[in-house]
UniProtKB/Swiss-Prot annotation:
It is found in: Cytoplasm. Transfers and isomerizes the ribose moiety from AdoMet to the 7-aminomethyl group of 7-deazaguanine (preQ1-tRNA) to give epoxyqueuosine (oQ-tRNA). The lineage of its organism: Bacteria, Pseudomonadati, Pseudomonadota, Gammaproteobacteria, Alteromonadales. It catalyses: 7-aminomethyl-7-carbaguanosine(34) in tRNA + S-adenosyl-L-methionine = epoxyqueuosine(34) in tRNA + adenine + L-methionine + 2 H(+). The gene is queA. It comes from Shewanella baltica (strain OS155 / ATCC BAA-1091). Coiled coil: none annotated. This is S-adenosylmethionine:tRNA ribosyltransferase-isomerase.
Length: 345
């Protein structure tokens, strides 16, 4: 398939630049993967669609304030966007400046912290913090929330809370697992009260999630890698859920990629997984674990719309997006959501 097959025209006013006043106040478009049938709902209607005994899997990564500003020794301004933390002192990062910093040069961050440019890895820079503090402590002090480029505004104080799920736990993401932004504590409690099981995996979403696909055909695309963890207790819960004939519902494409990465690595019976994954899911992929998913509306030609198309069928998904545009759903990270069931192969 060609990347251009996943293109669609989106009116600019449908890009959500701010979240709704309440997390669960979004709209929800339902898509039946088998029939292609659509339903226009409110997000809170999801409660009625998840059955007792179903397992919902959330990504509990925490977004770090990954954007920092500073200057080179020459005085030239630069912007640093963390791609991933390597340890307490070192990061891999995207650096924007008029000229790339040289190896062994120094960077002065806002707030007076200093970093050294240690190495270059393709388009990424390895930077080392020269401080008693950890990278996380410096990010908390001077970092900005890394809002996606299409939100097209500076980050505000409210984003520190709203570009973060209520159940976040493990710091390391530089983009939010956005399907989870719709859930508040009351909704999680209501799911538990209904005997829906809840489990958590971790995938630290990288800035690569916003990188456009720059090739003509899908098979040419090289997927960025991200760190994921699927613990044994989640594997056990999945086995129990499947044995009882119930569904595994993944909240977000990152949860889908975590679970399917574990399945790919174990080649058959699902096992716990911890490590880097570069799984690229596109039409033709056979899903091993996930039966239904909650997901936001994704960018045209992105690997994420390809994943949803693999799940519910290309024609069904592209038709759903045209419906969403006609019905003025809000798109992307701060936008509305979909509840999608898997198309049988």
């Amino acid at each position: 398939m060609r990347v251009a097959d996943f293109s669609f025209d989106l009116p600019d006013e449908l890009i959500a630049r701010y979240p709704m006043a309440q997390r669960n106040a979004s709209r929800l478009l339902t898509l039946d993967g088998n029939s292609g049938a659509l339903g226009d709902k409110q997000f809170t209607d999801l409660l009625g669609m998840i059955n007792p005994g179903d397992l919902m899997v959330f990504n509990n990564t925490r977004v770090i304030p990954a954007r920092m500003f500073g200057q080179k020794a020459s005085g030239g301004k630069l912007e640093i966007l963390v791609e991933r933390m390597l340890d307490d002192k070192r990061i891999l990062a995207h650096v924007r400046s008029s000229k790339s910093p040289k190896v062994d040069s120094f960077i002065l961050l806002d707030g007076g912290y200093q970093m050294k440019m240690v190495a270059r890895h393709d388009t990424l820079f390895e930077l080392e913090l020269l401080s008693e503090l950890t990278i996380l402590e410096v990010l908390e002090a001077v970092g900005h929330m890394p809002l996606p480029p299409y939100i097209d505004r500076p980050d505000e104080d409210a984003d520190k809370e709203r570009y973060q799920t209520v159940y976040n736990q493990n710091p390391g993401a530089v983009a939010a697992p956005t399907a989870g932004l719709h859930f508040d504590d009351a909704m999680l409690d209501a799911l538990k009260a209904k005997d829906v099981n809840i489990a958590f995996v971790t995938l630290h979403v990288g800035a690569g999630t916003f990188q456009p696909v720059r090739v003509d055909t899908i098979l040419e695309h090289k997927m960025h890698s991200e760190w994921a963890n699927v613990p044994q207790d989640v594997v056990d819960l999945i086995a129990q859920t499947k044995a009882a004939g119930k569904r595994v519902v993944a909240v977000g494409t990152t949860s889908v990629r975590s679970l399917e990465s574990a399945a790919r690595a174990s080649q058959g019976e699902l096992k716990a997984f911890s490590g880097d994954t570069d799984i690229f899911i596109y039409p033709g992929y056979q899903f091993q674990v996930v039966d239904a998913m909650v997901t936001n509306f994704h960018l045209p030609e992105s690997t994420l719309i390809m994943l949803v198309s693999a799940f519910a069928g290309f024609d069904h998904v592209m038709a759903a997006y045209q419906h969403a545009i006609a019905q003025k759903y809000r798109f992307f990270s701060y936008g509305d959501a979909m509840f999608v069931t898997k198309k049988a192969h």
